[in-house]
A protein has these predicted regions:
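Active-site metal-binding loops of divalent metal-dependent hydrolases
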Residues: 96
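Hydrophobic/aromatic ligand-binding patch that stacks against planar heteroaromatic rings
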Residues: 31, 55, 82, 113-114
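A cross-family acyltransferase "interaction/gating" segment
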Residues: 2, 38, 51-53, 89, ...
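Short, glycine/acidic-rich beta->alpha junctions
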Residues: 20, 24, 72, 103-107
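N-terminal signal-anchor transmembrane helix
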Residues: 1-11
């Protein structure tokens, strides 16, 4: 629901959403790409999987190692701003890791900071994709529970004003 919010939006934006499963990594780009060129912030280890890694790498993602938060911040802000200036939108999952329960305390402001720095709007994204669980051998590829419903909802675009705290709170409330 809410795809009209980015379909009619001129220029690139930052999509900010919660992160429940690997499903978002597959589905979000295919939902957005017909209207906006898009990439995302991904953990480096995802690029090492056979088949999945090269497909993901073809989107020219912003890669973070998740071992040095300062380096990751620089990578997201600089890499994200460069892609946004090229006209490519960026998907950010500020929780940094998947969780079947949304916890606002673990939802950081990196996406808001990126949008403010680049001067582009944010599109909040509320996701319910816990139908795809974590795997035993490979955490990123687990079983799919076909009885569970998935849900993707896009909010209205918002510009980041001032510190961005109010917008971060609005995004958090949209997801909840």
């Amino acid at each position: 629901a809410g795809m009209e919010h980015f379909r009619s939006l001129e220029g690139p934006c930052v999509f900010i959403g919660n992160h429940m499963s690997t499903l978002e990594t597959f589905v979000l780009p295919s939902m957005i790409q017909p209207w906006k060129d898009v990439t995302f912030v991904v953990k480096e280890s995802l690029l090492k999987y056979p088949f999945f890694g090269p497909v993901l790498g073809s989107r020219e993602p912003i890669v973070v190692g998740r071992s040095n938060p300062r380096e990751d911040l620089v990578a997201v802000l600089e890499g994200g701003e460069a892609r946004l200036k090229q006209g490519r939108s960026v998907i950010v999952f500020p929780q940094s890791t998947r969780s079947s329960v949304f916890d606002p305390a673990h939802f950081n402001t990196i996406g808001v900071k990126l949008a403010k720095r680049a001067g582009v709007p944010v599109i909040p994204v509320a996701l319910k994709t816990d139908a795809w669980g974590n795997g035993n051998l490979l955490k990123d590829f687990g079983p799919v529970d076909v009885k569970k419903t998935i849900h993707f909802e896009f909010g209205a675009p918002m510009r980041i004003e001032g510190t961005g705290k109010a917008e971060h709170q609005q995004i958090t409330e949209f997801i909840i």
